[in-house]
A protein has these predicted regions:
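N-terminal leader segment of winged-helix/HTH proteins
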Residues: 1-4
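Winged helix-turn-helix DNA-binding recognition segment
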Residues: 13-26, 31-82
Length: 82
């Protein structure tokens, strides 16, 4: 993350969900760091890939995983953290 003072609140249920990959949990944590007070964020896939040190394809896969488990939802270009 470019701003080292950035932080986020992560739900315990996400951290302990055995159905969720550790990579998706890490991405969720990063999304929480980008979220505003309404739990909405809109970082680019490229930015998320850079933050994770992974490919854009991997980030897209983890976003799908988080959506499948209903931890996030997409509305247009924005993600809402549920």
């Amino acid at each position: 993350l470019k701003n080292s003072n950035r932080f986020g609140i992560v739900k315990h249920t996400v951290c302990t969900d055995p159905e969720l990959s550790i990579q998706a949990k890490g991405l969720y944590s990063i999304l929480c760091c980008y979220a505003n007070k309404n739990r909405i964020c809109w970082p680019s896939i490229s930015t998320l890939a850079d933050d994770c040190g992974s490919s854009q394809t991997s980030v897209k896969r983890w976003i799908k995983e988080l959506k499948l488990h209903k931890y996030i939802k997409r509305v247009g270009h924005k993600l809402t953290i549920l």
